Amino acid sequence: GKSACELSPAVRHSLADLDIQVSTGPVVDFRLREHLRDLPKDGTVPLLYPGHFAASGLTWPLAGAKKPNAIQRSGATEKWLYPRGFYCVVRRFSSKEERRRVVAGVVDPGLLADAPMLGFENHLNLFHAHRHGLPEALARGLAVFLNTTAVDEQFRRFSGHTQVNATDLKRMTYPSRENLTRLGQWAMQQGQLTQAMIDAQFGTLTA
C-alpha cells in the first residue's frame, strides 16, 4: 500500500516550491584537520557532528567526545561555514539496528554561545535558505515532518540503503511552508516530543 505521505494531499510541495535548499555538510574533517579544535576558544566557531544531536535536542560542546567541537575561523575555512541561524539537519547514516532511517534535528543558535558562523560536518545534511538559516518555526516544523513515521516508511520503501543523502531529501515532497511553520509553532509549545505526538499532529495537516 501507499504510505501516509503519498496519500496526504497536504504533502505535495517540492523543496524548490518552498524556496528551501538541502546540502551535505561541507566540512570534511580529515581534509581540514589542522583547523579543528577539541574545544571552542578564541577564533573558533562551533563544528556540528551527528553526535551533537540527540532525541533531547542539541548539546554543544560535548565534553569528552571523540570528535572536535570547533573549527578555526580563517580565510582557509570561511567558505565552508554557514552564518549563525536556525537550521534543520538530517543524519546521513543510521545503523542497521536503529529504528529510524530518517533522523532530523534542529540547530538552535541560542545553544551555541554567540558564534557568528557554524561548521556542519560531512555526516549531516542541512536544510537552509540560500546558505542562510531558516525562520525558527520553519526549521522546527521541517524536523517534525521528517521525524514522522510516514516519512520514514516512505524512505525505506524507496531506498534500500541506510544512507540518507541530500539528493534523497531533494526528491521527497513536503507540506507547504505554512503547514511546516504551523507544525513548528506547535512543537515550540510542547516539551519533549514523542513519536505518537509527532504522528498525531502530522495527521491533522490539511492541504
Model regions and ranges:
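Polybasic, glycine- and aromatic-enriched phosphate-binding surface used to engage nucleic acids
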Residues: 3-192, 196-204
